[in-house]
Amino acid sequence: MTIHIPAACEGRLLRSYLKLTLGLSTAVLAKLKNHERGILVNGERVTVRYVLHEGDILEIQDRDTPETATEHVIPCELPLSVLYEDDHIIALNKPPHMPTHPSHGHLCDTLANALAYRYAAADEPFVFRPLGRLDRNTSGVVVAGKTRAASGCLGRSLKQGLVTKRYVAILVGEMTADGTLHSLEAPIYHPSTGGIKRAVGDPETNGAVYAKTLYRVLATGNGHTLVLCQPVTGRTHQLRVHFSHLGYPILGDDIYGKASPRMDRHALHALSLSLPMPFARMREDVAEYASPLVGLNPDLPLNLPTPDGYLHTWAPLPTDMEQAVADLFPQEARLALAPTVTTLKALDVSEA
């Protein structure tokens, strides 16, 4: 990555610029400092105590090399739907039934395997650095950093609460379609009985941790409810646990509800993910990122960076959920899931 230092950064310490402006983590910075050509200014290796000047050319060796790409993922040719890609990140639409990471029994059928094949074909070193993960049977948006620096930047944005994930789910049972933005706060814990199942609990008695979900009912019909939802926190199985706790389990969820002949998986899809683009602008002014949808042109295309340095991804529904929505709900429900900024605003607190 090459950056031309602007006049506004005259006199700043390089360390400050790397950490606050570019958002590099301490771990990423340490690796760059140990690399012979990790950080160069005007072609010369410098320390992070270097004082920047207008017109300096900063070069950061943040690309993986065969030596640094130590992760071994078997390249496997699998279907791969790319929503957006640049030098720093890639956004993908993960299909249902595909694990995110390799594991025992899933060594060559995962999203990581598909990406490894893509980059092996281009003769590029590969390390899989996803921003979070989706359950095998959950479809939708997965974003990954293509470099250590970009991944560190994404991780910082996530910790600062600047990343917004939106899901669409089909629930069993009919909620009240009142158009209200609902907020559910119910702590979640992992019972000691083993297995992967989580439950709503009490922080005092079983160590349950805080969990919050926002949701809005889009449509009801034929004994089911279509909801748009946002996990404000990121607990394991959070949406599945919360809706089951309300008495409206996700359709096809054989852990928190029951299996369904209509779908052979739980009807949950990661529809959209909004995040600040790595290195797009000054990172220290976090307040500017607080409400990225406010004032945004409703006709602005998704899956492209916005003028203010955000990316709002959008993953179309897979065939099984698209068919279920068509079978269960009126046509207006499909209009409520149109790929527009207006749809994204349905879960924005500032719009409630």
Residue spans for each PLM region:
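RNA pseudouridine synthases
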Residues: 1-352
